[in-house]
């Protein structure tokens, strides 16, 4: 690696550290002594970030892009959770030995900073404000997961798709006054997988929502009216 490349990577890590410090509401100076233990990585669309959350030793802050986290239970059920920047994950790995089985995939080109899990736990024990922030983030994540799981209990297909779209607007959508924008990674197939219904049925429901002027396509992005 040339000197210029090393300088660029060092600057990249410094900038990522600033974003991490801002995200968890602490002075960047608290994190700087641990910089050598962290890394910044770029993931291409479709690349696996980790195959199983019980194997990863790091907590990640997603700086750019979109990811999908797939949770598998003992019955073989799959729950798919989507995230956009900024999100810290997987938080349910903290302070416990047994963790849910989760795989993470980059839905778009992504950039993230990895922080050792034991470092995050150490900082929580020594800085109350970090613990409070992470507890708040974990509670928010749990509420989002409950909302998604409740959507899956809907017996009517259209109601299920509609509720999942509302969930997606909150978790990966960008607020534009009268509508939410969901980036181009969203597809009929992905929505079908998340809803647990056929692609054909999902496509039919999406066409109905477009006819009702609830959902629009802007290039490859989805625009969802707040009237949904």
UniProtKB/Swiss-Prot annotation:
Domain of life: Bacteria
InterPro entries named among the record's database cross-references: cNMP-bd_dom (IPR000595), cNMP-bd_dom_sf (IPR018490), HTH_CRP (IPR012318), RmlC-like_jellyroll (IPR014710), WH-like_DNA-bd_sf (IPR036388), WH_DNA-bd_sf (IPR036390)
Positions of the HTH crp-type domain: 155-228
GO molecular function ontology, one term from the record: cAMP binding
Keyword line: Activator, cAMP, cAMP-binding, Cytoplasm, DNA-binding, Nucleotide-binding, Transcription, Transcription regulation
UniProt binding sites for a nucleoside 3',5'-cyclic phosphate: 22-141
GO cellular component: cytoplasm
Pfam family, one: cNMP_binding
Single biological process term from Gene Ontology: regulation of DNA-templated transcription
Keyword Transmembrane attached: no
Signal peptide: none
Subcellular location: Cytoplasm
DNA-binding region: 188-207
UniProt function note: Positively regulates the expression of the arcABDCR operon under anaerobic conditions, thus playing an essential role in arginine catabolism. May also control the expression of genes encoding proteins which are involved in anaerobic metabolism. Can bind cyclic AMP.
Name the record gives this protein: HTH-type transcriptional regulator ArcR
Native source organism of the sequence: Staphylococcus epidermidis (strain ATCC 12228 / FDA PCI 1200)
Name of the encoding gene: arcR
């Amino acid at each position: 690696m040339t000197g210029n490349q090393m300088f660029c990577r060092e600057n990249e890590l410094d900038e990522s550290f600033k974003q991490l410090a801002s995200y968890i509401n602490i002075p960047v100076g608290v994190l700087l002594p641990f910089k050598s233990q962290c890394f910044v990585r770029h993931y291409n669309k479709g690349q696996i970030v980790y195959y199983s959350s019980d194997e990863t030793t790091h907590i990640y802050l997603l700086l750019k892009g979109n990811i999908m986290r797939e949770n598998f239970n003992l019955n073989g059920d799959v729950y798919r959770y989507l995230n956009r920047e900024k999100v810290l994950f997987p938080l349910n790995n903290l302070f416990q030995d047994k963790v849910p089985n989760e795989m993470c995939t980059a839905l778009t080109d992504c950039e993230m900073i990895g922080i050792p899990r034991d470092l995050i736990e150490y900082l929580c024990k020594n800085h109350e404000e970090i613990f409070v922030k992470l507890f708040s983030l974990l509670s928010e994540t749990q509420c989002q997961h409950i909302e998604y799981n409740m959507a899956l209990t809907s017996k009517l297909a259209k109601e299920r798709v509609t509720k999942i779209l509302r969930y997606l607007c909150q978790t990966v959508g960008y607020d534009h006054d009268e509508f939410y924008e969901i980036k181009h990674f969203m597809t009929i197939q992905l929505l079908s997988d998340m809803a647990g219904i056929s692609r054909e049925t999902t496509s039919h429901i999406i066409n109905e929502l477009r006819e009702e002027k609830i959902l629009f396509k802007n290039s490859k992005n989805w625009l969802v009216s707040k009237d949904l």
